[in-house]
């Protein structure tokens, strides 16, 4: 990967981790102060706003990244495309607010707490004006990360300062909204320095041309959104609330790990879109090959670690009462590898090529398999069955997308480098397995296992002269000498 891609990846990774840490730090405090009733009310209203946001966004954020990245070297065209997409998003947001008002004045449960509902709806406006997609498309990750992390730090301080008792629900909602989209107002103000709307007339704008392709992304988003909630919903109907709780504990840990792994995708999408639109196919293939190998390099030990350390991890993060989550975590952990591969081939290869119809087919296949597996496995195996269903469905999606994307790839997916990662992971597994038999606290067991496992895995890759291990080692030596 080029230097700028490495830097962008690190910055995006920092941004992703900060997004994961904010709720981990603030939620335990907020839940004790506001109690289940206050937290539940905010979450309920926020989930409704979330669905309205999904509809009003119409797939624009993901679509806009690709379209702006294509023309980012042409200042006039970049300005025009950005203005068109921003205008379209604002129009859709206007209709979204009409829906917000209708719901607020017709649904009794929401009408009783309109200030809270309207406060949370601020995310609709800030998301439209925030043009987060523009900064991703132009790869301005330094600005994105500094703003996002700063806002989250301020929001965390504000939450601990202002949320003092169970009546501070509005403060909690406002702070959470600001932590999520508060930096968007700065994005909008800064946009004036990045584009020039005087280069074209209003009559030249053609927002209609963006509707059809954005609708395709909206369809994809809807399928993915349904698929993500499917296990929990079906488990809730077919089994108990406790089963949902056990599944959620395992699922959240896996999704957090997956978010760290897939943070590279946010960096690669604009770069790949630009390479394809400008005809730099050789650069595209070279970067894609290296990025895929990096994904496998990280995903394999991550999956192995979660499977082997499921017991102490659940013990630390959820407590001993969540013991049934241990086999659930072990069953669902493989999706890190499966989703990593399928997501890379779908969103970093097929989507930049304009093959979103194929991506929709892959997502649909995954969802159908998930439904079938859930119907078969949940009645007998409860939350473990739901976890197995997730892994099987994501495996099927990975197989389908490998088959579909294969004809467009100019690099080998599986080679000797991947074999080294498998062998290195196997050696790491042996070491971690023996450490796991130690008689010590869960936290110590996790820390020692992760440290020793990482060292063993890294040393093996260094001995085999792996590109990433050698690069990381040279960077470490350079920093150490400096």
Locations of regions flagged by a protein language model:
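Helix-loop junctions and terminal segments of transmembrane helices
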Residues: 28, 57-73, 250, 254-299, ...
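N-terminal membrane topogenesis motif
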Residues: 1-24, 76-79, 191, 204-220, ...
């Amino acid at each position: 990967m080029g230097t700028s891609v490495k830097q962008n990846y690190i910055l995006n990774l920092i941004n992703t981790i900060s997004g994961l840490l904010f709720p981990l730090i603030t939620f335990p405090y907020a839940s004790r102060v506001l109690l289940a009733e206050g937290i539940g009310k905010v979450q309920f209203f926020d989930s409704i706003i979330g669905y309205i946001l999904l509809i009003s966004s119409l797939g624009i954020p993901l679509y806009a990244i690709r379209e702006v990245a294509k023309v980012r070297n042409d200042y006039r065209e970049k300005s025009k495309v950005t203005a068109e997409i921003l205008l379209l998003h604002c129009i859709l947001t206007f209709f979204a607010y009409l829906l917000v008002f209708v719901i607020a004045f017709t649904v009794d449960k929401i009408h009783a707490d309109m200030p809270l509902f309207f406060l949370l709806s601020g995310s609709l406006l800030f998301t439209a004006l925030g043009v987060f997609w523009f900064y991703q498309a132009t790869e301005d990750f330094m600005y994105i990360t500094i703003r996002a992390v700063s806002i989250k730090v301020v929001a965390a301080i504000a939450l601990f300062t202002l949320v003092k008792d169970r009546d501070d629900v509005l403060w909690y909602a406002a702070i959470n909204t600001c932590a999520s989209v508060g930096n968007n107002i700065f994005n909008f103000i800064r946009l004036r320095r990045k584009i020039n709307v005087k280069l074209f007339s209003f009559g030249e704008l053609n927002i209609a041309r963006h509707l059809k392709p954005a609708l395709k992304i909206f369809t994809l988003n809807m399928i993915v959104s349904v698929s993500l909630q499917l296990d929990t919903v079906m488990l809730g109907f077919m089994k108990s609330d406790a089963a949902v709780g056990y599944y959620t504990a395992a699922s959240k840990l896996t999704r957090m790990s997956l978010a760290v792994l897939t943070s590279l995708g946010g960096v690669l999408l604009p770069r790949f879109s630009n390479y394809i639109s400008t005809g730099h196919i050789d650069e595209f293939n070279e970067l894609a090959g290296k990025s895929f190998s990096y994904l496998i390099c990280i995903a394999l030990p991550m999956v192995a670690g979660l499977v082997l350390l499921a017991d102490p991890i659940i013990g630390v993060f959820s407590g001993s009462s969540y013991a049934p989550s241990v086999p659930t975590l072990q069953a669902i952990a493989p999706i890190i590898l499966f989703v990593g591969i399928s997501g890379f081939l779908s969103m970093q290869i097929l989507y930049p090529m304009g093959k979103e119809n194929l991506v929709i087919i892959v997502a649909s296949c995954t969802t159908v398999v998930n439904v079938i597996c859930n119907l078969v496995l949940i009645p007998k195996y409860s939350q473990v069955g739901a976890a197995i269903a997730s892994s099987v469905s994501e495996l099927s999606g990975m197989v389908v997308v490998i088959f579909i994307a294969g004809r467009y790839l100019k690099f080998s997916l599986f080679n000797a480098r991947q074999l080294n990662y498998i062998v290195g992971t196997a050696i790491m597994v042996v070491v971690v397995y023996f450490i796991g038999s130690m008689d010590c606290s869960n936290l110590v067991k996790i820390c020692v296992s992760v440290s020793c496992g990482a060292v063993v895995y890294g040393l093996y890759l260094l001995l085999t002269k792996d590109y990433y291990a050698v690069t990381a080692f040279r960077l470490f030596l350079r920093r150490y000498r400096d």
